[in-house]
From Swiss-Prot:
<keyword id="KW-0966">Cell projection</keyword>
<protein>
    <recommendedName>
        <fullName>S-arrestin</fullName>
    </recommendedName>
</protein>
<dbReference type="InterPro" id="IPR014756">
    <property type="entry name" value="Ig_E-set"/>
</dbReference>
<dbReference type="InterPro" id="IPR000698">
    <property type="entry name" value="Arrestin"/>
</dbReference>
<comment type="subunit">
    <text>Monomer. Homodimer. Homotetramer. Interacts with RHO (via the phosphorylated C-terminus).</text>
</comment>
<dbReference type="InterPro" id="IPR017864">
    <property type="entry name" value="Arrestin_CS"/>
</dbReference>
<keyword id="KW-0472">Membrane</keyword>
<dbReference type="GO" id="GO:0007165">
    <property type="term" value="P:signal transduction"/>
</dbReference>
<feature type="modified residue" description="Phosphothreonine">
    <location>
        <position position="231"/>
    </location>
</feature>
<comment type="function">
    <text>Binds to photoactivated, phosphorylated RHO and terminates RHO signaling via G-proteins by competing with G-proteins for the same binding site on RHO. May play a role in preventing light-dependent degeneration of retinal photoreceptor cells.</text>
</comment>
<dbReference type="GO" id="GO:0030507">
    <property type="term" value="F:spectrin binding"/>
</dbReference>
<comment type="similarity">
    <text>Belongs to the arrestin family.</text>
</comment>
<dbReference type="InterPro" id="IPR011022">
    <property type="entry name" value="Arrestin_C-like"/>
</dbReference>
<dbReference type="GO" id="GO:0051219">
    <property type="term" value="F:phosphoprotein binding"/>
</dbReference>
<dbReference type="GO" id="GO:0001917">
    <property type="term" value="C:photoreceptor inner segment"/>
</dbReference>
<dbReference type="GO" id="GO:0002046">
    <property type="term" value="F:opsin binding"/>
</dbReference>
<dbReference type="InterPro" id="IPR014753">
    <property type="entry name" value="Arrestin_N"/>
</dbReference>
Length: 403
């Protein structure tokens, strides 16, 4: 008789093997959440082949780097990369007292057996999140942005330089540092504006409101617009846009303001009348893939990502080391008839800020990591909701490890 009961959820483990098979790194996830007050540490294990390592030491490093764009900028005498953070731990042979193992590490040590060594890498609170500026379709090379890399390698040099690490004995993994929506929302965003036109005794009033402060990626954003036209002019068009503001603060304080979604109505507001209209926008990367300079959440290789999430900065942190700061606002623009009626026009606009983020993930403390439910997957990005596309990753049940 088949056993009854609740089936435990499989826990995907991401692994990568060096070319010479001497070291294999295992991570329980690829996205590490910045809770503002603290950041989830990178916990994992390294499987070492003592025969292939042959007395070398095995290290694991965590690097945060800001890339300025295409690498050919180096010919101008400038560096195209700046390391914002670097840390390294020796995992083999073990040094010092072993720290308390996480539940994930306990399960991996039990499953993988001897020659498996745990490591724990932490993020300081001043680092930016993973973000990049989307290149144009014809651009080649690495994109401008912030990325994080975990690397495991074997070396017989105590303090090896990057170019002296044997590539065949090293393995690199890109991970992401991400932020999710805070548990509590701020006040409901709204804005009011008035304009006085020449030869009009009374103003044109505009009121804009959103239903909440934070919207999740892929969620429709209803924007309620009320136009009170006390002038003798005609409001010919109402256009509502979601604009993304990417502030590259690390090297030049450049601002990139890009509309990522828009809707408009041609319904006119005649003199001495009022119109209330709700327009719904859905900002998606799927509708902006060809546009250079759009900020995206950092991605790994050529897999899916989404529009960059709004940046939350911990109080007291220096903004200039945050790489790229991302924010959003709703812009409402009115086209108003001019002196010659329909033949000419002028435009007025106002803005309402909001946040675009991912929801809080399930509490990891509620998930139990059981060694019999571990599923090993070659390191590759998973699909995200924002893109409007669906791709499947390749999973490897790794039957050979079940013994």
């Amino acid at each position: 008789m088949a056993a009854c009961g609740k089936t435990n959820k499989s826990h995907v483990i991401f692994k990568k093997v060096s070319r010479d098979k001497s070291v294999t790194i295992y991570l329980g996830k690829r996205d590490y959440v910045d809770h503002v007050s603290q950041v989830e540490p990178v916990d994992g294990v390294v499987l070492v082949d003592p025969e292939l390592v042959k007395g070398k030491k095995v290290y694991v490093t965590l690097t945060c780097a800001f890339r300025y764009g295409q690498e050919d900028i180096d010919v101008m005498g400038l560096t195209f990369r700046r390391d914002l953070y670097f840390s390294r731990v020796q995992v083999y042979p073990p040094v010092g007292a072993m720290s308390v193992l996480t539940q994930l590490q306990e399960s991996l040590l039990k499953k993988l057996g001897d020659n498996t060594y745990p490591f724990l890498l932490t993020f300081p609170d001043y680092l930016p999140c993973s973000v990049m500026l989307q290149p144009a379709p014809q651009d080649v090379g690495k994109s401008c942005g912030v990325d994080f890399e975990v690397k495991a390698f074997a070396s017989d040099i105590t303090d090896p330089e990057e170019d002296k690490i044997p590539k065949k004995s090293s393995v690199r993994l890109l991970i992401r540092k991400v932020q999710h929506a805070p548990p509590e929302m701020g006040p409901q965003p709204s804005a009011e504006a008035s304009w006085q036109f020449f030869m009009s005794d009374k103003p044109l009033n505009l009121s804009v409101s959103l239903s909440k402060e934070i919207y999740f990626h892929g969620e429709p954003i209803p924007v309620t617009v009320t136009v009170t036209n006390n002038t003798d002019k005609v409001v010919k068009k109402i256009k509502v846009s979601v604009e993304q503001i990417a502030n590259v603060v690390l090297y030049s304080s450049d601002y990139y303001v890009k509309p990522v979604a828009s809707e408009e109505t041609q319904e006119k507001v005649q003199p001495n009348s009022t119109l209330t209209k709700t327009l719904v926008l859905v900002p998606l990367l799927a509708n902006n893939r060809e546009r250079r300079g759009i900020a995206l959440d950092g991605k790994i290789k050529h897999e899916d990502t989404n529009l960059a999430s709004s940046t939350i900065i911990k109080e007291g942190i220096d903004r200039t080391v945050m790489g790229i700061l991302v924010s959003y606002h709703i812009k409402v623009k009115l086209t108003v008839s001019g002196f010659l009626g329909e033949l000419t026009s002028s435009e007025v606009a106002t803005e309402v800020p909001f946040r675009l983020m991912h929801p809080q993930p399930e509490d990891p403390a509620k998930e139990s990591v059981q060694d019999e439910n571990l599923v090993f997957e070659e390191f590759a990005r998973q699909n995200l909701k924002d893109t409007g596309e669906n791709t499947e990753g390749k999973k490897d049940e790794d039957a050979g490890q079940d013994e």
